[in-house]
């Protein structure tokens, strides 16, 4: 098999693959066997029709077509592996030359254009030191947690005064465009200052008492008229303020397992310290990835980026074409960072020679299923049927590569070496652990079995 590679862009290549007859012939033979299972030829048992008879009765063109459909994907994968190209998307394949008869010496030739991972050279991890902010717990942290707990036990009481920030107003809303009502809601409970509904609503409500009305111009954020300007009329039905319990021993015994307020505060301090250490570990992770990418120019595949940006916009607006410039810019920035991080972590996993077992992949998928309240077995089978096991293998590989890489460097805070072993764990030496390639191969078999089952 002859493979020529032409770099169209830093993240896009064109492969021209020419396959010798002796390498393509096994695919032709396999195609004849498959066709023989499906046709009835007088004088022969089904599935036992000689290849030459298949060529004569069915036609060599049909045989070659079947062989191309089955062979080109495999040959394409071999070409990628040979040239060490890591695809980021599905290829565009153009089959240019196919033999027209069993005696035709024409070589199979196809061209594959695909977006690829760019070449990335990571810095050496040996001797790398990364500074991370100290994990601190302040009195403010403890007081904030205490206040949050206090608010959980608060009650709403009606007040006879104008609404202020932090109050809860029961309101009726009516949106008009050109004098016509396009949306309305009644009896909505809204916390002033939360900014969780229409822009301008907080300002309009502040200072209004129960029974009073006002109007303002705002932009509708959902529905058929999303993004359009409308006259928003709002009526205040009632105003309630939050009444919080006193911070004393009685509150501590009611809100927790502790008898005194001092005991409760001490426990909150411990929880705050644990959270601070967790945030520090997250900061260490982010700083490590940033260190790997520092000084590197990492181009992202344009097509992959465009698809991910569109998907990102679908999460914030029903119609991506109506997204604002700010939304588009934010989506592009988010996607570019996500892609760069993914590519760097893939290279890191390869550099650290990460091993991924099938058990780890299935545990990873089971944890996702649990998060969404789904049956793990059903979720895993759906992933297999959709051919997405490869992506799961990749995600597990990235996570393990990240942990392995972080264990190889030194993290410091104010000159002192940090011990992040509680978050990074210990490097496992599992001789039975399978490689990423082996897990991927097993996944391919699972996908094939699922496809065969569906075909039945």
From Swiss-Prot:
Q: Which GO terms describe its cellular component?
A: cytoplasm
The disulfide bridges present are: none
EC number from the UniProt entry: 5.2.1.8
Q: Which gene encodes it?
A: tig
Keyword set, alphabetical order: Cell cycle, Cell division, Chaperone, Cytoplasm, Isomerase, Rotamase
Question: What biological processes does GO assign it?
Answer: 'de novo' cotranslational protein folding; cell division; chaperone-mediated protein folding; protein transport; protein unfolding
Q: Do you know which SUPFAM superfamilies this protein is assigned to?
A: FKBP-like, Triger factor/SurA peptide-binding domain-like, Trigger factor ribosome-binding domain
Domain writeup: Consists of 3 domains; the N-terminus binds the ribosome, the middle domain has PPIase activity, while the C-terminus has intrinsic chaperone activity on its own.
Record protein name field: Trigger factor
Q: Which NCBIfam families match?
A: tig
